[in-house]
């Protein structure tokens, strides 16, 4: 028994450690058994790791010239940050401060130190763990990849200034793409550039990270802000890298300390305040002796390209997933070649759009054509002094810098340049400068010197060209910014030939060759203005949706520039301002005084001011005077805010002809004359087009809403016509008065607008009051009811949705939804309870007409609900988006909608669940979710488990997921009706959850290719559970009809258990079970075995030990319909044909494929 246990232990350890090659990064903790076996404490105390690779330096000596001279090959340690140019937070900066800067909900990758497996936590969870006392921590976790660019923490941390000049991200990647990045996380779909420059590493005492090489061969800068670290360093020689790759592929990382296998290894301790630079390719392991906070970053550079490519190839061979690799690696390589060609030859291979955005080639220079040289020199010097990242440590110049003052002229000729270099252009494209000249990016280039590249750059660029040329077409990853990659490769080859004779001494300039043109002298076009909507001009006024934004033509030049918008304040007079909080809306529930977290910082929905006013502190932008009397009736002395240009002026101060448009809903708001008159012609033309289109749409929508007796054209003052006026999107929500002569409205129309405005205010108040009544059911009479006059105004016209039987022409029994308009006249004539009028059959609305209702009608329908409809039991949508139900109609409505929902896809059902609470419940009906497929999901989150429980599926597919035992146990305890469970590719640690008495009576169980399942595990599944003795002495899998065991390491012992505990089994999958023999077939078909009579389908494909004798045993199966023996090398086709001839006495069988025997029905 001991050799068998040893074999099991070795195979399990091998599988567990192979996961750490990142083939499946989402497995559960229980699955990994390859714990660390070497003594880490002994590795910390021994003296054999005494090699000397690290160089201690001063910050002032770390510059570009140092890297040009040595290529950044040795690890560097700086005991203090003087001269490095780094910036760090205050010494008392804590992990809680990190959480506040990046967000408490930010997801971070956390590594379990014991298993070297990654999990995810929120920053809030991690902070709680970090602040937990050491003795109370159950596990050791380590944060190693919190990238914090584009967060509040970004500006608190600055990397070494020298890194800024050699980092490919800053100098090679198109800068407009980096500037367009807005996402703070490392979501690859939202990433605009390789986001690897700033990392925060947080470790607790005792954390250990095994030997590794940073992704993509990147170099690393590493500053110990708090705590300390211990590093083991292995140089990246060819032999060591080969050992490292074999160590990764061996699956023995937990057993072998790589530092013991190499000839030289150095252990070095970093203390608080140290800055560490790890060059490309260095293999290192890290230990944390005390709780530590580290800031660092990764960067690629041009002085060790061969090593960077070599590490990327190792990642390919070890199959590291994309999540843990350098993003956009080959895209970056293409941009490196393009930048070198451009900076040396002034010839760009970028597309025109990229040239415009990153090189600013179509921009004019401010003082290119005019201005004297002295003024330019003074201005240039001032700008150079303001440049925080200017190189002051290297006085040697490299003649490759561009003539930034002449960039405009040079760039305008670029589109006509050839794709390849020519001999006559070498004098213009190769530039140099005398040694000892101070480097000035603003001065003109010196054309009497040739560019010199270091031998590191020449060798790296050659390797880069060879690598990109050798890639297959689907792996070249040519970015969209490169116009012609073949021409770029050709230009680089010619360039390398011309620069092959570069003088190594002249190349040590201390100045990087590749630099972006400075943008401080470039004129940028102003962005087009966007018309600011009238209603959302201030925050408190949020009762109505904002109109569609429309671009505005640039206004004429004006000496008055007042774009400062003012946040409006409450009027403190309207009903919304004087009432208290409701305590039930989502804003109130968020308030701290009602027990919420207080994140939204919004006022109650019922307290949103209906007419916010300008604050007292605003002044006229022309005269500078405040509004002395806000109650004044003199319009000329009132401060007015333009809803387009946001200018606040007294109308009397404007010395302009013509008048503007007044917003009657919002006080002190108008469209000033200069903004109104400018677009008057365009708006008039647009209004005519929209009115004509809207009339056609309304005619189509309202036609089926009329009853048979109504005329097609309603009277001018009928409720239907009022409905059209209310829904007219051409007129803004806030009606404005046209005060231009000859175009003013009549008194009747003004009264109509006033009446409609008052009615809309009443509708809002009524809707909010009814919401309060419904929320507080224990006090139904707590709110004052609306008067009969107000209800009469509301009943003028509104829409309801009811359910009706189809017309007589449609011979069916289903119930369909119907849209209906209730008019004031019909509402007054109907008794109470009210019966909704039926439409004539000829005018029954079709489905297309129902969909034609726009969002405006839907909003009015929600706002203009009527209490009497609820009393009558009519089914319709109320103001909260839920269904009013009464008696048996509730059940009827549910069944009607269920008949519709069952035709929807899963995605469409999820969309319907967002409509209202009632639809949410209906769409969770288990009849709609009989089968749920979560196969190959990267992570099974608790929300997904809760969703499964709500839907109570019959079939659940969790194949190839990282579900844990705890999660599966929680599921099976709450899914009593589960019949089909698919767990292919899962681990035994999860499948073992089925060995309990709470396991449902399954019909189908799929365990194909599950990890760690052998005969003992199958025994635990099939034997009666022992967790509740005396409850039931039968197997929980006794009702199984389909059992799939493909790819498992099982023997005849499993088959005996199947015969004993599965009397109803009809389909059995034993494919690719290598230990099965002819005797296995004999067991399945022996006299007295249940499978002899119950089996109908048997799959034994890929079982190489089966011979023709198996077919002799399989003849005993009584009701076989399919036998799959494909891939069984020792079974001949002739034997299969004889087998078919013997079976075809009673039924017909055929050999449909090679060794696939099927019954002909």
Curated annotation (Swiss-Prot):
Binds 1 Fe(2+) ion per subunit. The modification Phosphoserine is found at residues 28, 390, 394, 444, 558, 692, 718, 731, 825, 868, 882. It is an enzyme of class 1 (oxidoreductase). Coiled coil: none annotated. Its cofactor is Fe(2+). It is found in: Nucleus, Nucleoplasm; Chromosome. GO terms for cellular component: chromatin; nucleoplasm. This is Lysine-specific demethylase 2A. It comes from Mus musculus.
